[in-house]
Every structure is written in structure tokens, then in C-alpha cells.
Amino acid sequence: MITGIGIDLIEVGRVKKACEKDSFLKKCFTEREQELIRADINKAADNFAVKEAVAKMLGTGFRTLVPADIEVLRDPMGKPYVNLYGAAGELAKEQGIAAIHVSISNTRDYANAFVVGEK
């Protein structure tokens, strides 16, 4: 059963510029995500769009969540997946979310993410 959906569209250039600051990287991305971003800066916008979409799916936005508590990684085939920690993990557990499905699309200028929470 679907528990929630979230979508986000973000400008790649804005995220790339923000990533020039270590404080932004540390606040928004886990160590594993930072490794991914160092290898491919475009992943920063993709991941941030997923984080925004997950926060919307949970129904709070970032008012009560920390972006780094939503970790976005890729499996060996490149499929994105999400790990939740802290308040994001607790909220998902309270809502009975057992799986989060993620889709990312991007162009040179924009990254888009769509997520579905499922019981």
C-alpha cells in the first residue's frame, strides 16, 4: 500500500555552487554520499532532489528533518536507493513505511526525483 509520494525539481548549478562549501556538504550529505559526489559532482543535485522528495513524502519537508539523515546511494547497477537515519528513520517507522522507491531524471540544468513510500 502506498503511504506517500514526493517529487522535487532542482537546478543543478545551484547545488554545484553550494557544494563548494564544506559546511553544505557536511550538513546535507553522509560520508558515503560525499565520496560519490567527489567522483561525480552531478550526483549532488540528484541526491539533493531525492532528499527533498523523501522529506515531502514523509509529510514534513525539512522543518523537522536533517538532510544528511536521508542517505541516497546507488546499487551496483546504478539504481538509487535510500537509507534513513535519525528523525527521518523514526518518522518512516511511525508511518509504517517498509520500502521507498526512487526515480531520478536529469538534464544538464535540472535534476528531478520522484519517490513512493510503501507499507
PLM features: residue spans?
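Core catalytic alpha/beta fold that binds nucleotide/phospho-ligands
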Residues: 1-119
